[in-house]
Amino acid sequence: MHIVQALVSLGIGGSEMVAVEITEHLRANGHRVTVIAANGPLAGRVYDSGAQLLDWPIGKKRLGTLSYIRQLRSWIVENKPDIGHVHSRLPAWVCYLAIRGLALDERPVFITSMHGQYSVSSYSAIMARGDHVIAVSGHIRNYTLKNYLPAYHPDLHTIYGGTSRQAFPYGYQPATTWRKALYQEFPELENKRILLLPGRMSRYKGHATFIELLANLQSEFDDIHGVILGQARPGSRYINELEGLAERHGIADRLTFCGVRTDMRDWMAASALVFNLCSDPPEAFGRIATECLSLGVPLVAWNHGGV
């Protein structure tokens, strides 16, 4: 079969990791896969799997993105994919409009994956218009049924996200060379117990709560150091706000922003505690939680949503 995976970009994130892992699994089982997304750190894994990557920014919120509808329609006619699997809203609209202009026998099966609690709007409703709709957790299934679909919808499937125990083996420890490189890049972490908060730099990910927790612990534990992993532009307003909050709490020297990383397994295994603090809306699926627990690393998380 020929399967298309469509998403915003190949940056580091939950839905992006899911799309790449599906791609790798499909390729390992002999299927043809095409990924349509803007380039990013995960592109190497797509290429390594043997899949094709079309570096089309179909998730960029600008008028020019609509030009990809006709381009994609022509590509579908020429390449005849069997399935189109979309992982985000704007790519879903581009794919849906491209497919809608085709004859029924030329259309691939249109599958959408609900990776989050999208705002209730006609724009977001595209994620519930798939021939098949996938909810990544029971929490997202309930949210989808409440806001988009009737109580009985035969084509809504709950497929829980998971973590490979081969990729995140229990008791795993980073290599000595990794630790040496870590301390060279971040010398303030040497001989410290790392408290780690990974995830996208977004307000609902709980960064302010993490900083407040770190401040409350500093007087009792002098060997802890907070680390925030996540993609953000240097000097962004949100980063500046968090740095200001850390300064007001007197812990600016005990908190490090390490940016986006592809070695998450090593960071988790090197940490004393990992945090998953999504508040409102809650986490759609706790990928960080499953990876962390698979490694056997203690986790602190809110007991709600998809965690």
Where would I find each of the regions flagged by the language model?
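A short, active-site helix/loop in glycosyltransferases that binds the activated sugar's phosphate group
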Residues: D131-Y170
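Short His-centered aromatic/hydrophobic patch
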Residues: V86-A92, M114
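Active-site donor-binding acidic/aromatic loop of nucleotide-activated sugar
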Residues: P234-E241, A252-R261, W267
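Glycosyltransferase donor-sugar binding loop
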Residues: I36-P41, P198, H225-N240
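A conserved, positively charged/aromatic
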Residues: L104-G138, L149-A151
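N-terminal strand-loop element at the rim of the active site
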Residues: Q5-S67, P150, P154-L156, P234, ...
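Acidic donor-binding loop of glycosyltransferase active sites
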Residues: A269-A284, V297-P298
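A conserved mid-protein helix/loop that constitutes part of the nucleotide-sugar donor-binding site
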Residues: E16-E24, R193, L197, S202-S219, ...
